[in-house]
């Protein structure tokens, strides 16, 4: 969690300071208008029911009976969109047989790292979501795989997500290749060291913008061009972006 937002982690865990964020404020829109988070949560719930084999029909009735969705065309269209998005992910999953839960501990020198990783099927760790996978979520998936590899399992990770292109929901598949046990342990130890530093000072690391920066390097973009792209993303980002995050803006600033 400290790498997902190092600024927030430092303020909350080291200083005990919490700021109000956009999601903490009272919504100014009508209650029947779904925001992106509510749409995502609805689709995630539908996907969980599909995977577990539980009844979608019972859940649908509960949504309308409780008032979480309005009866009529609007509520039905919202539900239909959520189920469609969940179905696009579900149809790309190969969760056959008994799921494996990887658990144990890894000696990282000064720290013994313990934990567990779920959703293992046939030597593959499945990471899926009905939304787009952000850089911070990709980093989390990578750390989980390193933990599994450091336990001695030669497991890869398959990531399944969605992306909206020209108004159409597209499925994206990507993979993280396994690394050998020693390399995985070494990399985990480096993350442990970063965590210790994160309790001393806020790490100057912004997952989304950092990811965009390295993608620009891979595309051989000129430094001036990629710098301009990052500054623009920070200054003109949408709600929920790092440039709009209260914790980041208390610590970092970019030229305008």
Which residues make up each language-model segment?
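Structural signature of nuclease core domains in nucleic-acid processing machines
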Residues: 1-256
């Amino acid at each position: 969690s400290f790498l997902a937002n190092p600024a927030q982690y430092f303020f909350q865990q080291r200083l005990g300071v919490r700021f109000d964020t956009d999601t903490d404020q009272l919504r100014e829109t009508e209650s029947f208008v779904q925001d992106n988070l509510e749409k995502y949560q609805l689709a995630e719930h539908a996907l969980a029911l599909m995977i577990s084999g539980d009844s979608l029909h019972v859940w649908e009735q509960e949504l309308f009976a409780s008032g979480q969705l309005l009866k009529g065309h609007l509520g039905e269209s919202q539900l239909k969109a959520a189920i469609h998005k969940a179905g696009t992910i579900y149809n790309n999953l190969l969760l056959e047989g008994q799921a494996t839960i990887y658990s144990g501990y890894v000696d990282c020198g000064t720290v013994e790292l313990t934990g567990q990783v779920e959703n293992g099927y046939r030597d593959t760790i499945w990471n899926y979501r009905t939304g787009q996978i952000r850089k911070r979520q990709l980093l989390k998936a990578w750390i989980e795989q390193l933990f599994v590899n450091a336990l001695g399992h030669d497991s890869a990770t398959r990531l399944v997500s969605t992306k909206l292109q020209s108004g159409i929901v597209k499925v994206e598949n990507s993979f993280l290749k396994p690394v050998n046990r020693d390399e995985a342990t070494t990399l985990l130890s480096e993350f442990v060291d970063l965590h210790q530093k994160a309790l001393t000072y806020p790490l100057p690391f912004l997952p989304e913008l950092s990811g965009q920066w390295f993608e620009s390097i891979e595309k051989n973009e000129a430094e001036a061009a990629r710098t301009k792209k990052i500054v623009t993303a920070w200054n003109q980002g949408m709600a929920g972006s790092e440039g709009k995050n209260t914790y980041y803006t208390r610590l970092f600033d970019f030229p305008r």
